[in-house]
């Protein structure tokens, strides 16, 4: 078949468009240039020109960012001769009036929108055929907020430039600024300076600058604009008559100014007749953040200040077709401003200020624009009410106000621009697919498809307020929304230094429509910062985390695929309708069909992944909501229950008081009568019987009204539990298993001061020799540190609840909190604080009695929580592979720990001493339920004791699981750590065990920090009891035939309670907490020593040791910004290392620990491989990873 001559065939616009789309989609700028050079010829052809001019429109829909940057750089930003002499207009409008910025905003391509807004020739105020600006095309509120911030920043910079030009009297520069269409829209030459309250015209009238005043009046300055004090510009001129003779220069200037202003006034009066916009009520529209409630904080809302004097808000622009979420009448409102706040202000309305809207702008300039618009509306509304109250309008007022009262609210919303008042009925907004009328079918179809997508997204947006349904499936793609008022920015508004704003309006009347779902309480706190990552970087981003959750993942990719498919199909349909077809057409058709198929596959995959993730997020959110609901219910029930108990106790107290009073009043009469009728002996008996009856009656009443949980005194830790069992006990008081403690093994209450621990048994001697041989204590010759370099804790103050409120129901170990919540210790160092009172284990090893050893081991497991009181600051999360070593010559022990897992976070630890070993894993599951932060310990902990008198076995193995930890008092702003639950400490060698009971912190302080326990032998016979407060001291007592009840005296410590174990059944002190030093971060004296870095120790430390961590060191030095930056850096480095391992297919293995089955408990545990201390001695750490 003979091929047609392509040179004689008319150029096909659909064919060019398909080829251009394919080249743009490939992402290669050289390929794009090659296509234009070969296929887009001749350049002067109308079809070629039409496709070329819309190249940027197509690019923002299908091309990657790199190609768009190249197009802008080569064909938009340059004025030189370009490739093929192509020059593109950044603000080019397609057949629907959309610019590339409109399309990028609609398609949620935030990176493209930001790039375009940074171009010097961009004009974001261009209206499309539906009279919408680009910002009003946004479906994504995050992008709309970003556009608003960039606009405010641009206005601030331009206004400052304008102000400089005014000061320099640079008329040429002033003309160039005003010649920009964007500046003409955004800058208001009649705006007020927020500090002086003057317009630019007022300012130069005061300066008596006739030339500048004339220039201002020629360029739109309003001679009727009043300043803050209500004065017109002409009122600032001194009283002179035109016929007066100019006796001096000042009078001549005043005469000239007066003539100039009067002439401008006369000319302006003509404009008033034809254009009543100059005297309309202030109107404004845009996004503001509104305080919703205590749990959700600030949320972005669309606000409309309409000409009828009402300020209303909606979820977003698309929600304006429905009823507003709340509205205030400006005539009944006042503004409350704080000069220290640049972003926040408050509107007070209603009777006596019962309605308060706390609002927050995205930028100080945006906030000032809103403030002045609202102040103007309040003043205008009040003036109008005064006119209505005093009488009818004057003819001039009737001209400017009479018609507006008859116009509906919705019509007024579309009258904010002179262009809108003359426009026909608004139609649907469509995006660029082609540029002639033959594409109506494809355009409408595409609109319907995208409309459904937008409906679904919009419904998701509505979930953050109260129930809201929108079943209108036929609404247009973009509802015709009112234009954001832009002509309200003062040229003088941008000045260096803080702005002082004062309220000038008072409130007397109630609002028409109260806020329906977002009430504000005076008690609600306004803490900025919703997310951890925001405060980590020192920014304010309230509500953005919530907005990010609305739109879901892959939103930009999905929009690109949808638009690509739509454009491809529409262009393909065009091509198939072209009658002049040849082989090149069919090749392009095949390529296009393959592209569409590929896009459909990608779209289906992304949609499936998106659906799974959205379902997971919805499920998680539902669980979080359920937790909130249950927490509120539990709190309410708890408060009700306690209230009922208080009422019952008060009633009981009153009844008891009445009964006692009655008995006391009757008793003297009984005794008097008895003395008259009988002898003294009989009266004594009767009186005694009466008193006894009274006491019995009182006792019966108390027993009858006693609650089930009131069976013990708050000060008594131990009941007489052995009272019943004592009857079956042996007659002998001393048990055969409880021999008298040998004198030479009498324990000491405090740790020994000398550095040589007395070792007796051969296992102890062997272990001590090993510690010395491996150089465990080398580098620790210096005295321990007793203070920090910081004198006080001056961390930035951030409310704990303000951060945790967005983390309800989540595992906090996987979340990053701001560095200001940290203390300068690592979690590995926190683990080492468990052995602060290791001398208790040294004492335990001195006893022959295994049950007595169990008593002291149990006391040791409870003593490790004393350091947690007043320590709510969070330690630094260890990096994977991070280690920490610690040794004490006075305690003769060495400690080592390693972060062996990152998800879940697990720290393995191993401590060795001649008389004992302590090891285990810190593996916890944490969650926050809205009221408390709960930590559940998952790993087992072990202690190996090598007794001095190892008659039967050389070593004993103990194991236990730590109690549940809870941070309470978060809602009350007084967080504290509490322990609760039962813990069983087991001696697997002898069969002895101890049951410890940690009492949860109750409603009152009674019973706080309380712990009690019982020691049993292998035959379940109770031998010892212990009790006390885990934050202060623990006492022990031997169970004897006389009973086992034990009381705690926090203040007085009798001599009988000291000096070691007592076998006579008296109380003795086992452990007492050390006094806390007054240092920053509430560190203990032991914790102060952990992060110290003496010079002798540095050469022996592994490069992974926590002491060398830069963010932790900066935190200790008070360099909080550096600490935050370093923390972010090391975490990024850790993620990069993980990604590298995944790419190589490597599995991470800890360097110093290996997971095995424990030989006694048969549970998995992390065993120390013993290599660290030898490598430390030889300075052989060259194979350690670089994690810092």
UniProtKB/Swiss-Prot annotation:
Residues 415-546, 661-692, 721-755 are annotated as: Disordered. InterPro entries: Ankyrin_rpt, Ankyrin_rpt-contain_sf, OSBP_sf, Oxysterol-bd, Oxysterol-bd_CS, PH-like_dom_sf, PH_domain. Residues 443-462 have a biased composition (Low complexity). SUPFAM superfamilies: Ankyrin repeat, Oxysterol-binding protein-like, PH domain-like. ANK repeats lie at residues 51-80, 96-125, 196-225. It comes from the Eukaryota. Residues 800-1174 are annotated as: OSBP-related domain (ORD). This is Oxysterol-binding protein homolog 1. It comes from Saccharomyces cerevisiae (strain ATCC 204508 / S288c). The gene is SWH1.
């Amino acid at each position: 078949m003979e091929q047609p001559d392509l040179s004689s065939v008319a150029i096909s616009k659909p064919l060019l468009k398909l080829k251009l789309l394919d080249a743009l989609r490939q992402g290669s700028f050289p390929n794009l240039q090659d296509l234009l050079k070969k296929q887009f010829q001749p350049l002067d052809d109308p079809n070629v020109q039409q496709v070329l001019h819309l190249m940027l429109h197509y690019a923002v829909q299908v091309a990657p960012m790199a190609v768009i940057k190249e197009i802008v750089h080569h064909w938009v930003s340059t004025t030189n001769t370009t490739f093929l002499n192509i020059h593109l207009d950044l603000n080019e409008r397609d057949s629907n009036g959309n610019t590339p910025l409109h399309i990028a905003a609609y398609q949620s391509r935030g990176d493209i929108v930001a790039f375009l807004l940074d171009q010097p020739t961009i004009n974001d105020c261009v209206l499309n055929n539906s009279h919408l600006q680009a910002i009003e095309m946004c479906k994504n509120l995050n992008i709309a907020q970003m556009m608003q911030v960039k606009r405010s920043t641009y206005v601030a910079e331009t206004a400052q430039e304008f102000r400089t030009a005014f000061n320099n009297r640079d008329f040429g520069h002033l003309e160039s600024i005003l010649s920009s269409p964007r500046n003409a829209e955004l800058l208001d030459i009649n705006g007020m300076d927020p500090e002086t309250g003057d317009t630019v015209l007022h300012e130069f009238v005061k300066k008596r600058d006739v030339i500048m005043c004339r220039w201002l009046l020629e360029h739109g300055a309003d001679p009727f604009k009043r300043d803050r004090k209500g004065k017109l510009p002409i009122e600032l001129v001194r009283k002179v008559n035109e016929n007066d003779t100019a006796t001096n220069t000042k009078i001549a200037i005043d005469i000239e100014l007066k003539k100039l202003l009067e002439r401008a006034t006369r000319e302006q009066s003509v404009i008033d007749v034809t254009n009543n916009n100059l005297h309309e009520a202030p109107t404004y529209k845009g996004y503001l953040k509104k305080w919703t409630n205590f749990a959700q904080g600030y949320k972005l809302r669309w606000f409309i200040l309409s000409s009828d004097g009402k300020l209303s808000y909606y979820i977003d622009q698309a929600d304006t077709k429905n009823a507003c979420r709340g509205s205030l009448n400006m005539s009944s409102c006042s503004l409350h401003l704080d000069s220290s706040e640049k972003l926040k202000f408050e509107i007070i309305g209603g009777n006596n200020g019962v309605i308060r809207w706390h609002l927050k702008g995205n930028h100080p300039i945006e906030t000032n624009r809103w403030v002045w618009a609202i102040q103007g509306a309040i003043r205008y509304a009040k003036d109008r009410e005064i006119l209505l109250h005093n009488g009818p309008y004057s003819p001039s007022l009737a001209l400017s106000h009479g018609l507006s009262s008859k116009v509906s609210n919705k019509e007024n919303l579309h009258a904010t621009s002179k262009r809108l008042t003359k426009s026909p009925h608004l139609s649907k907004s469509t995006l660029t697919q082609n540029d002639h009328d033959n594409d109506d079918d494809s355009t409408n179809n595409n609109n319907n498809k995208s409309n459904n997508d937008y409906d679904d997204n919009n419904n998701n947006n509505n979930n953050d307020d109260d129930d809201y349904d929108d079943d209108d499936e036929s609404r247009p793609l973009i509802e015709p929304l009112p234009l954001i008022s832009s002509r309200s920015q003062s040229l003088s508004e941008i000045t260096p230094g803080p702005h002082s704003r004062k309220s000038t309006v008072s409130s007397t009347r109630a609002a028409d429509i109260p806020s329906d779902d977002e009430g504000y309480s005076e008690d609600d706190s306004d803490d900025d910062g919703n997310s951890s990552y925001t405060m980590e970087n020192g920014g304010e981003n309230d509500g953005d985390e919530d907005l990010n959750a609305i739109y879901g993942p892959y939103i930009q990719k999905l929009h690109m695929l949808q638009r690509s498919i739509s454009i491809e199909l529409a262009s393909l349909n065009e091509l198939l309708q072209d009658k002049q077809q040849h082989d090149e057409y069919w090749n392009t058709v095949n390529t296009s069909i393959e592209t569409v198929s590929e896009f459909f596959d990608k779209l289906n995959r992304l949609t499936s992944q998106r659906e799974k993730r959205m379902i997971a997020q919805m499920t998680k959110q539902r669980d979080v909501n359920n937790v909130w609901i249950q927490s509120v219910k539990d709190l309410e029930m708890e408060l009700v229950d306690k209230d009922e108990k208080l009422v019952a106790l008060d009633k009981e107290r009153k009844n008891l008081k009445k009964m006692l009073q009655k008995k006391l009043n009757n008793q003297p009469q009984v005794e008097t009568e008895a003395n008259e009728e009988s002898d003294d002996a009989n009266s004594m008996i009767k009186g005694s019987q009466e008193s006894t009856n009274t006491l019995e009656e009182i006792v019966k009443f108390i027993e009858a009204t006693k609650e089930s949980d009131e069976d013990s005194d708050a000060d008594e830790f131990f009941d007489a539990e052995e009272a019943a069992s004592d009857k079956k006990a042996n007659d002998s008081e001393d048990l055969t298993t409880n021999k008298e403690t040998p004198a030479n093994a009498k324990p000491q209450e405090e740790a020994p001061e000398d550095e040589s621990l007395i070792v007796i048994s051969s296992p102890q001697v062997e272990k001590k020799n090993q510690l010395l041989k491996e150089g465990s204590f080398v580098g620790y010759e210096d005295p321990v540190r007793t203070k920090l370099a910081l004198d006080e804790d001056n961390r930035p103050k951030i409310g704990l609840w303000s951060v945790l409120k967005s983390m309800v129901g989540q595992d906090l170990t996987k979340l990053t909190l701001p560095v200001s919540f940290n203390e300068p210790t690592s979690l590995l160092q926190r683990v080492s604080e468990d052995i602060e009172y290791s001398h208790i284990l040294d004492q335990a090893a001195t006893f022959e009695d295994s049950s007595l050893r169990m008593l002291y081991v149990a006391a040791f497991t409870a003593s490790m929580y004393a350091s947690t009181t007043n320590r709510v600051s969070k330690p630094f999360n260890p990096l994977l592979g991070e280690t920490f070593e610690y040794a004490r010559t006075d305690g003769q022990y060495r400690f080592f720990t390693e972060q062996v897992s990152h998800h879940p976070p697990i720290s393995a630890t191993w401590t060795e001493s001649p008389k004992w070993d302590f090891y285990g894993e810190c593996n916890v599951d944490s969650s926050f339920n809205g009221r408390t932060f709960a930590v559940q310990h998952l790993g087992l902990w072990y202690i190996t004791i090598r007794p001095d008198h190892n008659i039967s076995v050389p070593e004993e193995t103990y194991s236990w699981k730590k109690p549940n930890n809870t941070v309470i008092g978060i809602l009350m702003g007084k967080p504290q750590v509490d322990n609760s639950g039962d813990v069983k400490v087991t001696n697997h060698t002898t069969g002895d065990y101890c049951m410890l009971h940690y009492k949860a912190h109750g409603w009152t302080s009674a019973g706080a920090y309380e712990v009690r326990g019982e020691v049993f032998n292998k035959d379940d016979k109770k031998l010892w009891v212990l009790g006390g407060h885990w934050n202060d001291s623990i006492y022990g007592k031997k169970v004897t035939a006389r009973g086992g009840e034990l009381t705690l005296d926090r203040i007085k410590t009798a001599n009988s309670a000291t000096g070691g174990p007592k076998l006579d059944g008296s109380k003795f002190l086992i452990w007492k907490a050390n006094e806390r030093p007054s240092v920053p971060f509430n560190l203990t004296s032991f914790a102060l020593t952990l992060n110290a870095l003496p010079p002798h120790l540095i050469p022996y430390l592994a490069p992974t040791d926590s002491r060398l961590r830069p963010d932790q060191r900066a935190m200790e030095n008070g360099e909080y910004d550096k600490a935050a930056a370093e923390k972010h850096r090391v975490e990024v480095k850790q993620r990069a290392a993980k990604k590298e391992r995944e790419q190589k297919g490597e599995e991470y293995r800890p360097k110093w620990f290996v997971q095995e089955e424990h030989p006694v408990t048969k549970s998995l545990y992390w065993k120390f491989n013993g290599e660290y201390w030898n490598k430390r001695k030889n300075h052989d750490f060259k194979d350690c990873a670089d994690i810092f």
